[in-house]
């Protein structure tokens, strides 16, 4: 009802928990909604985080290089392989940094386990990462994360004995026997 009375053009809202993105066809309607949202939240003693909210021109006809972060992804305008407009998604820098720090900490905490056990547990973590972030347009990001994990695993296992017996060549031979989960795209459509 609220939408029909105040807004005449297309409007969409994507919401997850306490995060949401509102999409408007016209900028003036987005600005009006933003003001109404601030007033509405004020009635309940809440306020909007000014540093996390903004109105930005985005879409097929705007031709901007603007991007925004939502749910761990950076969303940006692009063209598909066929030259058609699409919105592509890549892992946001902030989330990627957090994931890297977490996996590095985990590897150092588990450096004294056997390499086979570590890889088995690590593959579960990698699969979860790929299933969430494995969408069309983000394959390079998945590869970078895979290479980072592979490198950190090698460093942690080398550090374990402090004799550095585990050369890169030996390590790659171990990975042939106990392979790390390789990146995979799970959602292939570009929308």
Predicted regions and their residues:
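Non-catalytic terminal/accessory segments
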Residues: 3-191
């Amino acid at each position: 009802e609220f939408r029909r009375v105040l807004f005449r053009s297309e409007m969409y809202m994507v919401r997850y928990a306490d995060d949401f993105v509102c999409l408007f066809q016209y900028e003036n309607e987005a600005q009006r909604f933003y003001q109404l949202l601030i007033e509405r939240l004020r009635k309940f003693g809440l306020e909007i985080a000014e540093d996390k909210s903004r109105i930005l021109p985005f879409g097929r006809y705007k031709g901007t290089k603007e991007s925004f972060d939502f749910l761990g992804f950076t969303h940006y305008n692009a063209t598909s392989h066929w030259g058609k407009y699409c919105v592509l998604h890549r892992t946001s820098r902030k989330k990627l940094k957090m994931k890297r720090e977490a996996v590095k900490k985990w590897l150092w905490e588990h450096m004294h386990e056997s390499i086979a056990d570590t890889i088995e547990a690590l593959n579960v973590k990698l699969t979860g990462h790929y299933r969430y972030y494995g969408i069309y347009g983000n394959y390079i990001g998945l590869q970078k994360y895979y290479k980072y994990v592979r490198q950190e695993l090698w460093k942690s296992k080398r550090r374990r004995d402090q004799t550095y017996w585990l050369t890169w060549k030996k390590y790659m031979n171990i990975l042939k026997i106990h392979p790390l989960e390789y990146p995979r795209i799970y959602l292939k459509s570009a929308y």
